[in-house]
């Protein structure tokens, strides 16, 4: 994908990108971008089959761990929602990192190597995956695509004289409970497992923090005698921006050897850490992303990324950073694009074709 493309271009790509989620070991439940199996292209909509069997086969195609497969089979709408969640997560990850050296490369061998280490990038993958699943499930409930959940009734919010609860809110209560059970928790003695689980929860908490109450007025002549209100999730792009900020301020915890950075040593617990037995728990109470290892530079091709040689960059914005001081090539090309578009009655858009010359910058090898 081209760096610097508008968000709309990334969202349009969703029609052709649907990724397979996977689970790993019996002791752990992993999801989407954090699975070790290859991300495989699947149809977003299920093929027409006998209604009673279609979602069973879809869940089997996802190659889930036993518990996850059982949860998938409970509701005919889960399989399609899981696939949608992975697609959302992948697209948002690539959009948020489009100007970075690591541009959320999800090719199998790079992703597999990355997930074996506790980098900041790994933390982001866990958080964006759990956030994507939480968001997609809550929306699927309110859209009527699930059998075991419907709209959010918000029983914890007080009805007031001036307004009443109504509409169809996104069911965050159901989705967050489902996600925590779906992802599971590994042994608390395993620091890496606890770090991964912590980052999963950060994704869920960011979704919760973005919930807003939306209201619609009812009354004579535009008055607001009665308001109908419901809870609505923030657009997933806003969630992605929030998680990207958390990635940039991620906290390093624990004690580990950094093969990627060539360093080793004990790390002091971060601010706001939880007090475990003997005060030894390094994980923070606050919803911050945490990591164990220093990230590699991602400048050169290696185990964790294909490097930045040949990457497109923006001369005034990020060429110096992305190209790692190697400089960049400049290529001039002529492009033709629709321009001066007008809507004609009825009902089509008429555009002229405008030709212009533009310069493309790519990193030197």
Swiss-Prot record:
The keyword Translocase does not apply. A lipid is attached at residue 221 (O-palmitoleoyl serine). PROSITE patterns: WNT1. Residues 260-287 are annotated as: Disordered. One of its GO terms (cellular component) is extracellular region. One of its GO terms (biological process) is cell fate commitment. One of its GO terms (molecular function) is receptor ligand activity. Glycans are attached at residue 103. Disulfide bonds join 93-104, 141-149, 151-168, 215-229, 217-224, 299-324, 313-319, 323-363, 339-354, 341-351, 346-347. Keywords: Developmental protein, Disulfide bond, Extracellular matrix, Glycoprotein, Lipoprotein, Secreted, Signal, Wnt signaling pathway. It is found in: Secreted, Extracellular space, Extracellular matrix; Secreted. Residues 1-29 form the signal peptide. Palmitoleoylation is required for efficient binding to frizzled receptors. Depalmitoleoylation leads to Wnt signaling pathway inhibition. Its main location: secreted. Belongs to the Wnt family. Forms a soluble 1:1 complex with AFM; this prevents oligomerization and is required for prolonged biological activity. The complex with AFM may represent the physiological form in body fluids. Ligand for members of the frizzled family of seven transmembrane receptors. Functions in the canonical Wnt/beta-catenin signaling pathway. Required for normal timing of IHH expression during embryonic bone development, normal chondrocyte maturation and for normal bone mineralization during embryonic bone development. Plays a redundant role in maintaining joint integrity. This is Protein Wnt-9a. It comes from Homo sapiens.
């Amino acid at each position: 994908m081209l760096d610097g493309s508008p968000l709309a271009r990334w969202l349009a790509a969703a029609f052709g990108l649907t990724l397979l989620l996977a689970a790993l070991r019996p002791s752990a439940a992993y999801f989407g971008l954090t699975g070790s199996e290859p991300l495989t292209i699947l149809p977003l909509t299920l093929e027409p089959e006998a209604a009673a069997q279609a979602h069973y086969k879809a869940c089997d195609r996802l190659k889930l761990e036993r518990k996850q497969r059982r949860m998938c089979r409970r509701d005919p709408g889960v399989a399609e929602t899981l696939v949608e969640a992975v697609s959302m997560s992948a697209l948002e990850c690539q959009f948020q990192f489009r100007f970075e050296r690591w541009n959320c490369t999800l090719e199998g061998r790079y992703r597999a190597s990355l997930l074996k280490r506790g980098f900041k990038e790994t933390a982001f993958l866990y958080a964006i995956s759990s956030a994507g699943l939480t968001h997609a499930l809550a929306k699927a409930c309110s859209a009527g695509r699930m059998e075991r959940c419907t709209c959010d009734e918000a029983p914890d919010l007080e009805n007031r004289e001036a307004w009443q609860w109504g509409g169809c809110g996104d069911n965050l209560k159901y989705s967050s409970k489902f996600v925590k059970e779906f992802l599971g928790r590994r042994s608390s003695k395993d620091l890496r497992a606890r770090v991964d689980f912590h980052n999963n929860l950060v994704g869920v908490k960011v979704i919760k923090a973005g919930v807003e109450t939306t209201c619609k007025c009812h009354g004579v002549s535009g008055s607001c005698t009665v308001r109908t209100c419901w809870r609505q999730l923030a657009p997933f792009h806003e969630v992605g921006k929030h998680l990207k900020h958390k990635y940039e301020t991620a906290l390093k915890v624990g004690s580990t050897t950094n093969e990627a950075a060539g360093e080793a040593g004990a790390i002091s617990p971060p601010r706001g850490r939880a007090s475990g037995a003997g005060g030894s728990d390094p994980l923070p109470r606050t919803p911050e992303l945490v990591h164990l290892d220093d990230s590699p530079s991602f400048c050169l091709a290696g185990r964790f990324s294909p490097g930045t040689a040949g990457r497109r960059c923006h001369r005034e914005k990020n060429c110096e950073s992305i190209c790692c001081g190697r400089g960049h090539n400049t290529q001039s090309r002529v492009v033709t694009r629709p321009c001066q578009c007008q809507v004609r009655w009825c009902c089509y858009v008429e555009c002229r074709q405008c030709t212009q010359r533009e310069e493309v910058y790519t990193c030197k090898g």
